[in-house]
Amino acid sequence: MKIIFQSCFQEYMRKCGTTLVQTHQLVLDNAWINDMFAGEYNPCHFHASKNSLVGLSSVLFLKTPDTYGEEIINPKTPSNGHLEFIGGAQHSLSISQFRTSPKVGDFFVFPYTLVHGVYPFSGTDQVRRTLSYNCDILPKVMIKAK
């Protein structure tokens, strides 16, 4: 599993066109599973590491409920059970918020510093299960010194 995540993080960096690929190394930091039930949510937050100011996070959706329940707040812009990313430039030609209704198998990789959160859902006793991994991006010279 570790090799799969590391490969995804490396591909993300390549697609971003960053030169960090040559000068830095990916170090997988920690992994965890989240089980969330109706009414539970994950407030907006970002990730950090004691080892690096630069890193990547990921979330893989392993299980999702059959329904996220009736949309009460604003049916035109649903949010029940959605994953939301917040960031980017704040002007009219930029998307500063991205919200998605995740399905089993959806996999997202994003920078540590990207603010994100998960909305609560209702109408079911089924679980939403995710697997997340954090990855530090450390200078190769720092790793050799250890």
Over which residues does each language-model region extend?
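Signature of the catalytic double-stranded beta-helix
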Residues: 1-54
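Catalytic core of non-heme Fe(II) oxygenases with the double-stranded beta-helix
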Residues: 34-109, 113, 119, 125-127, ...
